Amino acid sequence: SRKDFPILSREIQGNILTYLDNAASSQKPMEVLEGIKQFESNDYSNVHRGLHTLSVLSTSAYEESRKIVQKFLNAKSSDEIIFTSGGTDSVNLVASSYADENLSQGDEIIITTMEHHANIVPWHFLRERKGIQIKWIDCDQNGKFDINQFEKAITSKTKFIAVTQMSNVLGASPNIKNIIDLSHSQGIPVLIDGCQGVVHEKIDVQELDRAFYLFSGHKLYGPNGIGILY
């Protein structure tokens, strides 16, 4: 409720704040703000870098949060959860590691016109480095993902697919299970940008059949500067 968010009690230009920009970044509830304050005030130290009490406490909290994310996504192991600085960093990590290592000149990546820039720019950089080709899937006349166009776009040269779970502009939600099943049936890995979708839809990464999945904390009522890559 509104009372859980301290910032929503302030006035701007004589009116109580009504915040409608959650697709860009969400406000923080008191529980999150107090959790940050508690940690920074009492337990903060370097993680995995010391044997003293504060370092042990910080490391324990760090790894416990990884297990919480594992449970949230229904991952098989907490080792499958990678902390990043956000959604953009997660895409860049996949592009500069897996894709950079496994794609060659002339290979194709498929992305959609619904993507956030964070799921576009890294693939342009990869194109400059490796000479790959980018194929675009347009929305249909209703602003929805065109699965028929997507299926026709896949060729023997298609080596990677990156698609949003939910458009931050249109709110359209492609059927990611269909996309993954179709792609994996032809041996093509998939990255799902879940920054918008994870807020609204329950995710079971085991059902996604080993697809890359990512999201950020600041759109999920969490702190800035934290992201997840599965």
Task: Indicate residue ranges for each PLM-predicted region.
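Pyridoxal 5′-phosphate
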Residues: 1-230
